[in-house]
């Protein structure tokens, strides 16, 4: 699963996830892309599950790029622990997603195959997405 090798700080503030994606909002590497249309967080498990579903559907054809990386730690306190006593331990990692963010890209397959692969992948993700094609080469 994806997670940073090392970070400057173990835990981060909750923060706010608002605004639009200013970077990574166009198909840059492949021919087709899966673009987020809503705010949300993608866990490392969700990213991996969607990657597997795309890989299984296209089999050996095509090349895929993952355009998001889970670099934010999410903490959780153990069950039946009283409030206070500091912040909990890191439970999992997430990538914060804004509308317009490209999540996956693919090339080397037909549009029908790419559409179906991304449809299967979108079912594994917690944000709404749309299928986009590259406009200019």
Curated annotation (Swiss-Prot):
PROSITE patterns: RIBOSOMAL_L16_1, RIBOSOMAL_L16_2. Keywords: Ribonucleoprotein, Ribosomal protein, RNA-binding, rRNA-binding, tRNA-binding. The keyword tRNA-binding applies. It holds the Pfam family Ribosomal_L16. GO terms for cellular component: cytosolic large ribosomal subunit. The keyword Metal-binding does not apply. One of its GO terms (biological process) is translation. GO terms for molecular function: rRNA binding; structural constituent of ribosome; tRNA binding. Part of the 50S ribosomal subunit. NCBIfam families: rplP_bact. Binds 23S rRNA and is also seen to make contacts with the A and possibly P site tRNAs. Belongs to the universal ribosomal protein uL16 family. This is Large ribosomal subunit protein uL16. The lineage of its organism: Bacteria, Pseudomonadati, Pseudomonadota, Gammaproteobacteria, Lysobacterales.
């Amino acid at each position: 699963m994806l997670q940073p090798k090392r970070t400057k700080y173990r835990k981060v503030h909750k923060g706010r996830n608002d605004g639009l994606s200013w970077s990574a909002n166009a198909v840059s590497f492949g021919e087709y892309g899966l673009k987020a249309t809503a705010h949300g967080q993608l866990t490392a498990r969700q990213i991996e599950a969607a990657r597997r579903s795309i890989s299984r559907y296209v089999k050996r054809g095509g090349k895929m790029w993952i355009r998001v990386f889970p670099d934010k730690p999410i903490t959780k306190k153990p069950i039946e622990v009283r409030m206070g006593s500091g912040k909990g331990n890191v439970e999992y990692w997430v990538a914060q997603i804004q509308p317009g963010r490209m999540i996956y890209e693919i090339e080397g397959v037909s549009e029908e195959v790419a559409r179906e692969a991304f449809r299967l992948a979108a079912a594994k993700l917690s944000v709404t997405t749309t299928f986009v094609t590259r406009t200019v080469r």
